[in-house]
């Protein structure tokens, strides 16, 4: 099976290494030839709109390597084939608030949280949740990026 992956970073590399053990071939839509996965399969460099068309014709199934994938690219690729997970799942996971609210709604246990947009809201959240606490950005955080440990109120 040819698996298309939107993105060619370290997560795509780990996916490819596992897929090869199962006999699959990989195709990547990358930002650069230097991306970590680009040596592990046919790679299309996303530097013009025609590339997405070419990439879209060269796989049996497509996925993306992280929640930071551009939803507009997923929408273009899905015009030719299904993308798993769906773009609605991608949209949900691109914002921690949407993600946490869904988990809470489904009664799936998760750490206490409060969405904040100001210092006043942060102080209120700390009073409610307690310290120590971790302040996280709502978007674009990964591997510790966008996370701040709060140990005290000062």
Region spans (language model):
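ATP-binding N-terminal substructure of ATP-dependent carboxylate-amine bond-forming enzymes
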Residues: 1-94, 98, 120
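Active-site nucleotide/adenylate-binding loops and adjacent lid/helix of ATP-dependent enzymes
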Residues: 94-154
């Amino acid at each position: 099976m040819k698996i298309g992956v939107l993105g060619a970073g370290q997560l795509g590399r780990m996916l490819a290494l596992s897929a090869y053990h199962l006999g699959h071939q990989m195709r990547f839509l990358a930002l650069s030839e230097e991306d970590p996965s680009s040596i592990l399969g046919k790679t299309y460099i996303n530097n013009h709109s025609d590339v997405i068309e070419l990439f879209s014709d060269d796989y049996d199934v497509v996925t993306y390597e992280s929640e930071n994938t551009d939803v507009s690219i997923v929408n273009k690729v899905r015009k030719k084939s299904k993308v798993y997970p769906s773009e609605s799942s991608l949209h949900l996971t691109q914002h921690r608030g949407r993600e946490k609210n869904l988990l809470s709604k489904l009664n799936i246990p998760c750490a206490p949280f409060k969405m904040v947009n100001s210092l006043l809201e942060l102080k209120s959240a700390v009073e409610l949740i307690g310290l120590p606490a971790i302040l996280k950005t709502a978007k674009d955080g990964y591997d510790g990026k966008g996370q701040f440990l709060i140990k005290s109120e000062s």
